[in-house]
Amino acid sequence: MAAAAEGDEDPRWRRCNTDCVYFLASPFTCTKGSKCEYRHADGARFNRRNCWYWFKGNCVNPSCTFRHPPLENLNKTKSLADPLSLCSTSVKAANPCYFYYNSHCSKGDNCPYLHEPLTSNDAVGTSCKATTSNPAVSKSYVGDEMVEESKDTITNPCQDTSCHIKEVPVSINPEFGEAEAVSGALETSTDIDEYMKCSAVSDLNSGDSTMDHTEQDERDSSPGFDVLVDDCLSNKSDLEHQLTTESDNKVLHAEYGIRDPVLYDMYYHDPEYYNYEPEFCGLDDRQGYLYLCQPNGAHEHESEITLGHLLPQNTEVTSDEYDRRFFNPRNFTSSVADTNFVHQHTQIRHISKRRPENRKGAKGKKDCIKRSRCLEPKNSTQQIESMPTRQRKDYLMGECPQPANHATFRGRRKKNRGKQQHVLSAKSSEHPTADFTGPKTLAQIKEEKCKSNSSFSHSTACTPNVRSFSDDFEGPKSLTELLMTKSRSSVGK
């Protein structure tokens, strides 16, 4: 209290304990920072309640979290202390307030616990007062019952038996009396649980609703218990679940080695990419191959279009490894993963990918007719083993050679057209026309026409002799008769 009194006389002490109004508004508003003469307390900035002891002029807590507004316009007169409060302070002197020393006590003088620093002399004096102020208890026995008559001299705010103040025995020896008093005070200061219980009882008895509201806010904002748990997270928004799903999909379709799934669809068609009239594919019955015709103007895809098992590019494998890899019976068995893969990639067959405009007019090696192996041959093992090593390698890599017997439909069409032209040219060569000598008269034209008709009738005159053979047919003959006629004809020759 003396320090508080001295602090009231010192204006610098009052100024350093007064809150900075700029800092209360925002920490960045005060431009002085640590050089500011007023107090910068973060706890007071978030707490809107004023310090009761600050208005009384005796707040000695440097870390007080209540606000200390300026006191120039306030009345500095101090009210006299209530005798009941003095008696209560004499009783509560040995019990320091836990909330006050943690900067959270909002009861002021109504708090039943000590709000001042505890010294050894104060502990001895308060312990003596506590022993003298205990009520006298007289016990009288009536029969088997014990009747207790107590005389209460001071009303204790804590009526619970768990909140009774521990008495410190006073030693007669003055040398050890002070040490025992200090040890008793330290023992009583460790009962924090009793402080909490008594403060809860006093909160129920107090009529200050604003104080109760403050403690309710403090209980709501207690650290360590306000834990927010979100149980509504779905698997779709879970990053770990998405990464796991993507990795599973990659492992599931790793055997296909697909970079662009649209190009591997058997129904993929891009009219802007193919600048030609659509052609069709067909099956070569002689060898059992299905070819995809790509006429002139088509360009290479980034990946080869096949319907068989796909190989990674830029790999060279021997023929024995091809036999072991591609003709394993397990590779030709269907599974659930393959079925799901085909179903997934057939759903996007109508997607058309645009190609750069500068590739439409490209020419060169890409303009040649290309085809890819679509189905395995009917007699796959025997026919492939009979192929040469180079041809077998090209076949398995999807780059099939172009022999004459494996011509495409477009090649067949060109071939047929060439044959027709050859036949027409042969017919024209059989009937050579005379050199043009000039215009002819009508008589000459009729004469040439008669000559052509006579030659035609001469050629048809031989047909009755041929048909006479059919007129001599008498019916079916036995084998012996046929042999006899054959032997006769051979003898006649």
From Swiss-Prot:
InterPro entries: Znf-CCCH_3, Znf_CCCH, Znf_CCCH_sf. It holds the Pfam family zf-CCCH_2. Residues 452-468 have a biased composition (Polar residues). Residues 409-420 have a biased composition (Basic residues). A zinc finger (C3H1-type) spans 14-43, 45-71, 91-118. Keywords: DNA-binding, Metal-binding, Repeat, Zinc, Zinc-finger. One of its GO terms (molecular function) is zinc ion binding. Signal peptide: none annotated. Residues 397-477 are annotated as: Disordered. This is Zinc finger CCCH domain-containing protein 34. It comes from Oryza sativa subsp. japonica. The lineage of its organism: Eukaryota, Viridiplantae, Streptophyta, Embryophyta, Tracheophyta.
